[in-house]
Amino acid sequence: MEYLAKNKNTYFLGQATVFPGTAMFNTLKDINNSKKIELPVAEEMQMGMTLGFMLDGKTPISIYPRFNFLLSSINQLVNHLDKFKEMTGGKNSKAIIRTSIGSIIPLHPQCQHVGDFSKEIKSLCKNINVVKLDNPKKIFNEYKKALNRKDNISTILIEYGDFYNSK
């Protein structure tokens, strides 16, 4: 995340960006708080803010700690983020959506926190790059690629929560 934070146009928004609460917080703790926006549990609002950052020419990294939570923003994701270039006449801006398939180790959080909706999101969003980070060695390169895309296609990067405990 430090690599992404070095870019003057990036901002991190979501739950547990400024205050601890998820495993993802530890990946953001060394990033200056001026680059982070802590949000309440309001996923659709968060996606709307993500779009607002894009309209302002910024590259938001919008963090949804669990894939299941991202579902609450599906309207904005499918109807606005996926159609962003068409709706804005080709505005050159992109977002990075960071989410995770919830960990089951050391404690299983139950079915509402461990969903993998990769295939479904790919079928709904034809203009968003959807990447499952199933190998820890791919993680940095995929984030770097998402940030540096010249075509300004937004990317959803799907992490595995258990990697925080085992890799």
Regions found by a protein language model. Name each.
Residues 1-166:
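Thiamine diphosphate
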